[in-house]
Amino acid sequence: MAKQDYYEILGVSKTAEEREIRKAYKRLAMKYHPDRNQGDKEAEAKFKEIKEAYEVLTDSQKRAAYDQYGHAAFEQGGMGGGGFGGGADFSDIFGDVFGDIFGGGRGRQRAARGADLRYNMELTLEEAVRGVTKEIRIPTLEECDVCHGSGAKPGTQPQTCPTCHGSGQVQMRQGFFAVQQTCPHCQGRGTLIKDPCNKCHGHGRVERSKTLSVKIPAGVDTGDRIRLAGEGEAGEHGAPAGDLYVQVQVKQHPIFEREGNNLYCEVPINFAMAALGGEIEVPTLDGRVKLKVPGETQTGKLFRMRGKGVKSVRGGAQGDLLCRVVVETQIGLDEKDKQLLHELHESYGGPTGEHNSPRSKSFFDGVKKFFDDLTR
Protein backbone atom coordinates (compact mmCIF):
# COMPACT_ATOMS: atom_id res chain seq x y z
CA MET A 1 0.00 0.00 0.00
CA ALA A 2 1.35 3.44 -0.96
CA LYS A 3 2.30 5.64 1.96
CA GLN A 4 0.32 8.82 2.49
CA ASP A 5 1.96 12.16 1.77
CA TYR A 6 3.55 13.64 4.91
CA TYR A 7 2.09 17.09 4.25
CA GLU A 8 -1.40 15.57 3.89
CA ILE A 9 -0.96 13.63 7.14
CA LEU A 10 -0.35 16.88 9.04
CA GLY A 11 -2.83 18.87 6.96
CA VAL A 12 -0.34 21.56 5.92
CA SER A 13 0.80 22.93 2.56
CA LYS A 14 4.16 22.04 1.01
CA THR A 15 5.39 25.58 1.69
CA ALA A 16 4.36 25.52 5.37
CA GLU A 17 6.85 27.03 7.79
CA GLU A 18 8.16 25.07 10.76
CA ARG A 19 5.90 26.78 13.27
CA GLU A 20 2.82 25.83 11.19
CA ILE A 21 4.02 22.21 11.14
CA ARG A 22 4.58 22.22 14.90
CA LYS A 23 1.13 23.69 15.51
CA ALA A 24 -0.55 21.07 13.30
CA TYR A 25 1.45 18.31 14.99
CA LYS A 26 0.41 19.41 18.48
CA ARG A 27 -3.26 19.43 17.51
CA LEU A 28 -3.20 16.00 15.85
CA ALA A 29 -0.96 14.41 18.48
CA MET A 30 -3.39 15.50 21.20
CA LYS A 31 -6.25 13.90 19.28
CA TYR A 32 -4.58 10.54 18.55
CA HIS A 33 -2.24 10.14 21.54
CA PRO A 34 -2.32 6.54 22.93
CA ASP A 35 -3.03 7.82 26.45
CA ARG A 36 -6.28 9.29 25.16
CA ASN A 37 -7.19 6.32 22.95
CA GLN A 38 -6.28 3.26 24.99
CA GLY A 39 -6.89 0.03 23.07
CA ASP A 40 -7.64 1.86 19.80
CA LYS A 41 -5.25 0.31 17.24
CA GLU A 42 -6.29 2.72 14.46
CA ALA A 43 -5.53 5.74 16.64
CA GLU A 44 -2.17 4.20 17.58
CA ALA A 45 -1.29 3.68 13.90
CA LYS A 46 -2.40 7.22 13.07
CA PHE A 47 -0.26 8.61 15.89
CA LYS A 48 2.79 6.79 14.48
CA GLU A 49 2.13 8.30 11.03
CA ILE A 50 1.84 11.78 12.52
CA LYS A 51 5.06 11.29 14.49
CA GLU A 52 6.91 10.05 11.40
CA ALA A 53 5.70 12.96 9.25
CA TYR A 54 6.68 15.46 11.95
CA GLU A 55 10.20 14.07 12.28
CA VAL A 56 10.86 14.43 8.55
CA LEU A 57 9.23 17.83 7.98
CA THR A 58 10.94 19.56 10.91
CA ASP A 59 14.41 18.38 9.88
CA SER A 60 15.62 20.63 7.05
CA GLN A 61 17.83 17.97 5.41
CA LYS A 62 15.21 15.23 5.60
CA ARG A 63 12.53 17.60 4.36
CA ALA A 64 14.63 18.66 1.37
CA ALA A 65 15.24 15.00 0.48
CA TYR A 66 11.53 14.20 0.85
CA ASP A 67 10.50 17.19 -1.29
CA GLN A 68 12.78 15.95 -4.06
CA TYR A 69 12.38 12.18 -3.92
CA GLY A 70 9.31 11.48 -1.78
CA HIS A 71 9.24 8.36 0.39
CA ALA A 72 11.93 6.78 -1.82
CA ALA A 73 14.49 9.04 -0.12
CA PHE A 74 14.19 6.98 3.08
CA GLU A 75 13.87 3.46 1.72
CA GLN A 76 16.57 0.82 2.29
CA GLY A 77 18.07 2.56 5.28
CA GLY A 78 18.00 5.98 3.68
CA MET A 79 17.55 7.58 7.10
CA GLY A 80 21.02 6.50 8.21
CA GLY A 81 19.83 3.25 9.80
CA GLY A 82 17.84 5.06 12.46
CA GLY A 83 14.54 5.13 10.60
CA PHE A 84 11.92 7.02 12.51
CA GLY A 85 12.27 5.09 15.74
CA GLY A 86 13.94 7.59 18.04
CA GLY A 87 16.25 10.51 17.93
CA ALA A 88 13.61 13.26 17.80
CA ASP A 89 13.13 15.12 21.06
CA PHE A 90 9.37 15.18 21.38
CA SER A 91 9.48 16.66 24.88
CA ASP A 92 9.65 20.17 23.42
CA ILE A 93 6.33 19.54 21.69
CA PHE A 94 4.52 17.55 24.34
CA GLY A 95 5.88 19.09 27.52
CA ASP A 96 3.35 21.89 27.66
CA VAL A 97 0.52 19.73 26.33
CA PHE A 98 0.67 16.26 27.89
CA GLY A 99 2.42 17.52 31.00
CA ASP A 100 -0.64 19.59 31.83
CA ILE A 101 -3.07 16.73 31.15
CA PHE A 102 -1.29 13.64 32.42
CA GLY A 103 0.97 15.14 35.08
CA GLY A 104 4.21 14.43 33.23
CA GLY A 105 5.57 17.94 33.48
CA ARG A 106 9.11 18.56 32.31
CA GLY A 107 9.94 21.54 34.45
CA ARG A 108 10.84 24.98 33.21
CA GLN A 109 10.07 25.71 29.57
CA ARG A 110 12.91 26.57 27.31
CA ALA A 111 12.78 29.99 25.67
CA ALA A 112 11.17 29.72 22.23
CA ARG A 113 13.42 29.44 19.18
CA GLY A 114 13.03 32.31 16.73
CA ALA A 115 10.53 32.02 13.91
CA ASP A 116 11.64 30.99 10.42
CA LEU A 117 11.24 33.62 7.69
CA ARG A 118 10.58 33.31 3.97
CA TYR A 119 11.73 35.64 1.20
CA ASN A 120 10.42 35.30 -2.37
CA MET A 121 13.20 36.00 -4.88
CA GLU A 122 12.47 36.54 -8.57
CA LEU A 123 15.27 35.66 -11.01
CA THR A 124 15.75 35.90 -14.75
CA LEU A 125 16.39 32.64 -16.58
CA GLU A 126 20.00 33.71 -17.17
CA GLU A 127 20.52 34.33 -13.44
CA ALA A 128 18.96 30.99 -12.53
CA VAL A 129 21.09 29.08 -15.05
CA ARG A 130 24.43 30.76 -14.30
CA GLY A 131 24.00 31.53 -10.60
CA VAL A 132 24.09 34.97 -9.03
CA THR A 133 24.74 36.76 -5.74
CA LYS A 134 22.01 39.18 -4.66
CA GLU A 135 21.53 41.50 -1.75
CA ILE A 136 18.17 41.40 0.00
CA ARG A 137 16.70 43.51 2.78
CA ILE A 138 14.32 41.88 5.24
CA PRO A 139 12.39 43.12 8.29
CA THR A 140 13.01 40.88 11.29
CA LEU A 141 13.33 40.66 15.07
CA GLU A 142 16.92 40.79 16.28
CA GLU A 143 18.44 40.31 19.70
CA CYS A 144 18.43 43.54 21.69
CA ASP A 145 21.98 44.93 21.75
CA VAL A 146 21.40 46.63 25.12
CA CYS A 147 20.28 43.68 27.26
CA HIS A 148 21.71 41.00 24.91
CA GLY A 149 18.38 39.19 24.80
CA SER A 150 17.73 38.85 28.53
CA GLY A 151 14.99 41.50 28.55
CA ALA A 152 16.33 42.91 31.84
CA LYS A 153 17.72 46.39 32.32
CA PRO A 154 21.56 46.43 32.22
CA GLY A 155 22.93 45.85 35.70
CA THR A 156 19.90 43.79 36.76
CA GLN A 157 18.94 40.15 36.36
CA PRO A 158 15.61 38.36 35.83
CA GLN A 159 14.16 37.33 39.21
CA THR A 160 13.01 33.85 40.21
CA CYS A 161 9.23 33.55 39.88
CA PRO A 162 7.67 33.56 43.38
CA THR A 163 4.69 31.46 42.24
CA CYS A 164 6.53 28.42 40.86
CA HIS A 165 9.89 29.10 42.58
CA GLY A 166 11.73 28.85 39.28
CA SER A 167 10.32 25.49 38.14
CA GLY A 168 8.03 26.98 35.50
CA GLN A 169 5.20 24.69 36.68
CA VAL A 170 2.57 24.70 39.40
CA GLN A 171 0.73 21.71 40.85
CA MET A 172 -3.05 21.64 40.98
CA ARG A 173 -4.98 18.99 42.92
CA GLN A 174 -8.14 17.53 41.41
CA GLY A 175 -9.54 14.92 43.76
CA PHE A 176 -7.00 12.12 44.10
CA PHE A 177 -4.90 13.43 41.22
CA ALA A 178 -2.13 16.01 41.18
CA VAL A 179 -1.93 17.76 37.81
CA GLN A 180 1.03 19.89 36.77
CA GLN A 181 0.36 22.99 34.72
CA THR A 182 2.43 25.76 33.20
CA CYS A 183 2.87 28.57 35.68
CA PRO A 184 0.41 31.34 34.72
CA HIS A 185 2.60 34.00 36.35
CA CYS A 186 5.83 33.50 34.35
CA GLN A 187 4.36 31.45 31.44
CA GLY A 188 6.71 28.59 32.26
CA ARG A 189 10.00 30.51 32.10
CA GLY A 190 10.67 30.31 35.82
CA THR A 191 11.80 33.95 35.93
CA LEU A 192 10.23 37.40 35.89
CA ILE A 193 11.68 40.68 34.72
CA LYS A 194 11.12 43.38 37.33
CA ASP A 195 13.28 46.04 35.68
CA PRO A 196 12.74 45.69 31.92
CA CYS A 197 15.24 46.94 29.39
CA ASN A 198 14.34 50.45 28.18
CA LYS A 199 15.04 49.59 24.55
CA CYS A 200 13.17 46.28 24.08
CA HIS A 201 10.74 46.75 27.02
CA GLY A 202 11.53 43.32 28.42
CA HIS A 203 11.06 41.33 25.21
CA GLY A 204 14.76 40.75 24.55
CA ARG A 205 14.20 41.48 20.84
CA VAL A 206 13.78 44.60 18.71
CA GLU A 207 12.40 45.18 15.21
CA ARG A 208 15.05 45.88 12.60
CA SER A 209 15.70 45.54 8.89
CA LYS A 210 18.88 43.81 7.84
CA THR A 211 20.68 43.38 4.53
CA LEU A 212 21.98 39.96 3.53
CA SER A 213 24.07 38.78 0.60
CA VAL A 214 22.51 35.62 -0.83
CA LYS A 215 24.49 33.35 -3.16
CA ILE A 216 22.16 31.59 -5.61
CA PRO A 217 23.78 28.43 -7.05
CA ALA A 218 23.73 27.80 -10.80
CA GLY A 219 20.86 25.63 -12.05
CA VAL A 220 18.10 26.58 -9.60
CA ASP A 221 14.49 26.56 -10.81
CA THR A 222 11.10 27.78 -9.68
CA GLY A 223 10.13 26.15 -6.38
CA ASP A 224 13.68 25.61 -5.12
CA ARG A 225 14.42 26.86 -1.59
CA ILE A 226 17.73 28.10 -0.20
CA ARG A 227 18.14 27.89 3.58
CA LEU A 228 20.18 30.48 5.46
CA ALA A 229 20.66 29.01 8.93
CA GLY A 230 20.23 31.40 11.83
CA GLU A 231 19.08 34.33 9.67
CA GLY A 232 15.45 34.20 10.80
CA GLU A 233 14.00 35.98 13.80
CA ALA A 234 16.02 36.03 17.02
CA GLY A 235 14.83 33.61 19.69
CA GLU A 236 13.17 34.71 22.90
CA HIS A 237 15.50 35.66 25.76
CA GLY A 238 18.67 34.39 24.11
CA ALA A 239 17.20 31.25 22.46
CA PRO A 240 18.57 30.25 19.01
CA ALA A 241 17.44 32.23 15.98
CA GLY A 242 15.22 30.74 13.30
CA ASP A 243 16.24 30.24 9.67
CA LEU A 244 15.58 32.24 6.51
CA TYR A 245 14.26 30.40 3.45
CA VAL A 246 14.72 32.06 0.06
CA GLN A 247 12.01 30.83 -2.33
CA VAL A 248 13.04 30.96 -6.00
CA GLN A 249 10.69 32.12 -8.79
CA VAL A 250 12.10 32.27 -12.35
CA LYS A 251 10.58 34.84 -14.73
CA GLN A 252 9.20 33.83 -18.10
CA HIS A 253 11.78 34.22 -20.89
CA PRO A 254 10.89 35.77 -24.28
CA ILE A 255 12.74 33.07 -26.25
CA PHE A 256 13.37 29.98 -24.13
CA GLU A 257 11.16 27.67 -22.12
CA ARG A 258 12.68 25.42 -19.49
CA GLU A 259 11.64 21.86 -18.77
CA GLY A 260 13.89 20.20 -16.21
CA ASN A 261 17.45 20.75 -17.44
CA ASN A 262 16.45 21.15 -21.09
CA LEU A 263 15.66 24.40 -22.89
CA TYR A 264 13.20 24.73 -25.78
CA CYS A 265 12.82 27.44 -28.41
CA GLU A 266 10.93 27.91 -31.70
CA VAL A 267 12.94 28.78 -34.81
CA PRO A 268 10.99 30.21 -37.79
CA ILE A 269 12.29 29.42 -41.31
CA ASN A 270 10.88 30.32 -44.71
CA PHE A 271 9.46 27.89 -47.25
CA ALA A 272 12.57 27.92 -49.44
CA MET A 273 14.87 27.08 -46.52
CA ALA A 274 12.54 24.28 -45.43
CA ALA A 275 12.41 22.79 -48.93
CA LEU A 276 16.03 23.22 -49.98
CA GLY A 277 17.85 23.14 -46.63
CA GLY A 278 20.62 25.42 -45.48
CA GLU A 279 22.32 26.85 -42.42
CA ILE A 280 20.80 29.26 -39.90
CA GLU A 281 21.87 30.92 -36.65
CA VAL A 282 19.99 30.01 -33.48
CA PRO A 283 20.27 31.60 -30.01
CA THR A 284 21.67 29.87 -26.94
CA LEU A 285 22.35 31.25 -23.47
CA ASP A 286 26.06 31.34 -24.44
CA GLY A 287 25.56 33.17 -27.75
CA ARG A 288 24.62 32.29 -31.34
CA VAL A 289 25.46 28.96 -32.93
CA LYS A 290 25.02 27.52 -36.44
CA LEU A 291 22.29 24.95 -37.11
CA LYS A 292 22.22 22.92 -40.32
CA VAL A 293 18.68 22.42 -41.62
CA PRO A 294 18.28 19.51 -44.07
CA GLY A 295 16.07 19.82 -47.14
CA GLU A 296 12.40 18.80 -46.94
CA THR A 297 12.17 19.86 -43.28
CA GLN A 298 8.61 20.03 -41.91
CA THR A 299 7.09 22.25 -39.20
CA GLY A 300 7.52 20.70 -35.77
CA LYS A 301 10.83 18.97 -36.42
CA LEU A 302 13.07 19.10 -33.34
CA PHE A 303 16.81 19.66 -33.55
CA ARG A 304 18.78 18.78 -30.41
CA MET A 305 21.90 20.74 -29.47
CA ARG A 306 23.62 18.71 -26.79
CA GLY A 307 25.04 20.43 -23.73
CA LYS A 308 23.39 23.78 -24.52
CA GLY A 309 20.79 23.49 -21.78
CA VAL A 310 21.02 23.88 -18.00
CA LYS A 311 23.50 22.27 -15.62
CA SER A 312 21.59 20.69 -12.74
CA VAL A 313 22.01 22.34 -9.35
CA ARG A 314 22.25 18.81 -7.92
CA GLY A 315 25.04 17.71 -10.26
CA GLY A 316 25.01 15.43 -13.27
CA ALA A 317 25.08 16.02 -17.02
CA GLN A 318 24.12 19.35 -18.55
CA GLY A 319 20.78 19.50 -20.35
CA ASP A 320 20.21 20.14 -24.06
CA LEU A 321 18.67 22.87 -26.21
CA LEU A 322 15.83 21.65 -28.43
CA CYS A 323 14.94 23.87 -31.39
CA ARG A 324 11.49 23.35 -32.91
CA VAL A 325 11.27 24.46 -36.53
CA VAL A 326 8.22 26.46 -37.68
CA VAL A 327 7.87 26.86 -41.46
CA GLU A 328 6.53 30.39 -42.00
CA THR A 329 4.32 31.42 -44.93
CA GLN A 330 5.75 34.40 -46.79
CA ILE A 331 3.82 37.69 -46.79
CA GLY A 332 4.13 40.88 -48.87
CA LEU A 333 4.59 39.00 -52.15
CA ASP A 334 4.76 41.00 -55.42
CA GLU A 335 3.15 39.86 -58.68
CA LYS A 336 6.32 38.14 -59.88
CA ASP A 337 6.58 36.13 -56.65
CA LYS A 338 2.92 35.12 -56.90
CA GLN A 339 3.30 34.03 -60.52
CA LEU A 340 6.29 31.86 -59.64
CA LEU A 341 4.37 30.27 -56.78
CA HIS A 342 1.36 29.59 -59.04
CA GLU A 343 3.64 27.78 -61.46
CA LEU A 344 5.25 25.85 -58.62
CA HIS A 345 1.83 24.99 -57.23
CA GLU A 346 0.68 23.56 -60.56
CA SER A 347 3.88 21.56 -60.91
CA TYR A 348 3.04 19.86 -57.60
CA GLY A 349 -0.15 18.44 -59.07
CA GLY A 350 -2.64 20.91 -57.59
CA PRO A 351 -3.94 21.02 -54.00
CA THR A 352 -3.57 17.29 -53.45
CA GLY A 353 0.19 17.51 -53.85
CA GLU A 354 0.20 14.12 -55.49
CA HIS A 355 3.86 14.20 -56.46
CA ASN A 356 5.60 16.39 -53.91
CA SER A 357 3.39 16.54 -50.81
CA PRO A 358 2.76 13.01 -49.51
CA ARG A 359 1.02 14.22 -46.34
CA SER A 360 -1.37 16.42 -48.35
CA LYS A 361 -2.17 13.54 -50.69
CA SER A 362 -2.77 11.21 -47.75
CA PHE A 363 -5.08 13.78 -46.12
CA PHE A 364 -7.21 14.38 -49.22
CA ASP A 365 -7.39 10.64 -49.92
CA GLY A 366 -8.71 10.18 -46.38
CA VAL A 367 -11.31 12.95 -46.84
CA LYS A 368 -12.52 11.38 -50.10
CA LYS A 369 -12.88 7.95 -48.46
CA PHE A 370 -14.79 9.51 -45.53
CA PHE A 371 -17.43 11.06 -47.81
CA ASP A 372 -17.59 7.96 -50.01
CA ASP A 373 -18.40 5.88 -46.93
CA LEU A 374 -21.16 8.34 -45.93
CA THR A 375 -22.93 8.05 -49.29
CA ARG A 376 -22.93 4.26 -49.48
From Swiss-Prot:
GO MF: ATP binding; heat shock protein binding; unfolded protein binding; zinc ion binding
CXXCXGXG motif repeat start-end pairs: 144-151, 161-168, 183-190, 197-204
Annotated positions binding Zn(2+) 1: 144, 147, 197, 200
Source organism, top-level taxon: Bacteria
GO biological process: chaperone cofactor-dependent protein refolding; DNA replication; protein refolding; response to heat
Cofactor binding: number and manner: Binds 2 Zn(2+) ions per monomer.
Induction pattern: By heat shock.
SMART domains membership: DnaJ
Zinc finger (CR-type): 131-209
SUPFAM superfamilies in UniProt: Chaperone J-domain, DnaJ/Hsp40 cysteine-rich domain, HSP40/DnaJ peptide-binding domain
Keyword Zinc-finger: yes
Domain spans labelled J: 5-70
Subcellular location: Cytoplasm
Known cofactor(s): Zn(2+)
Entries under Pfam families matching the protein: DnaJ, DnaJ_C, DnaJ_CXXCXGXG
Main location: cytoplasm
Entry binding sites for Zn(2+) 2: 161, 164, 183, 186
Protein's UniProt keywords contain Ribosomal protein: no
Protein keywords: Chaperone, Cytoplasm, DNA replication, Metal-binding, Repeat, Stress response, Zinc, Zinc-finger
Family as reported in the entry's similarity comment: Belongs to the DnaJ family.
Domains as described in the record: The J domain is necessary and sufficient to stimulate DnaK ATPase activity. Zinc center 1 plays an important role in the autonomous, DnaK-independent chaperone activity of DnaJ. Zinc center 2 is essential for interaction with DnaK and for DnaJ activity.
Assembly notes: Homodimer.
Function: Participates actively in the response to hyperosmotic and heat shock by preventing the aggregation of stress-denatured proteins and by disaggregating proteins, also in an autonomous, DnaK-independent fashion. Unfolded proteins bind initially to DnaJ; upon interaction with the DnaJ-bound protein, DnaK hydrolyzes its bound ATP, resulting in the formation of a stable complex. GrpE releases ADP from DnaK; ATP binding to DnaK triggers the release of the substrate protein, thus completing the reaction cycle.
Protein name, per record: Chaperone protein DnaJ
